[in-house]
Amino acid sequence: MDALTELAEEHADFVEKLSELEAALDEMMGTHSASDEDIELVEESVRFFEQELLPHFEREEKHLLPALERKIGRFGTLVNVVAYEHDEIRREVHKIKEALAALQAKRPAPHLAEIEELNRHVVFTIQFLWDHFRKEKTSLFATAREVLSPEELESIGVHLSG
């Protein structure tokens, strides 16, 4: 499997996790309450972001983006857009952690405002990630296949699998 296919398949795994998180937030919004199971699922999602998603971004930034930058430049290109989006998602993961901590501190007292704040950040992050993954699949990876040689793609794959 080549490097770009590997990255795209990781995206598919991430979408499944995002769907689980979205379902938990929908339940919390519908019931105006966060159960222990809901909190556990959000905590698991935060761990997933930190242990799977953000390292995925770091691998792209360390191996794929520099190779593309050498070919097409950075500013005004997809390289810059993708790097910016990675930073934005990192900021949102931090905001999700803060909102989760506020929710946990408020329970078991009424905590709808905290659920709404958590929901706001989670919904933004999920929508942003879906768009980000689509952009990488349809634009960034296509550009990489056009401008990088088979040897460069193979080298990226070796480093990604590292």
Q: For the regions a protein language model found, what residue spans apply to each?
A:
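Small-residue-biased structural context
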Residues: M1-G162
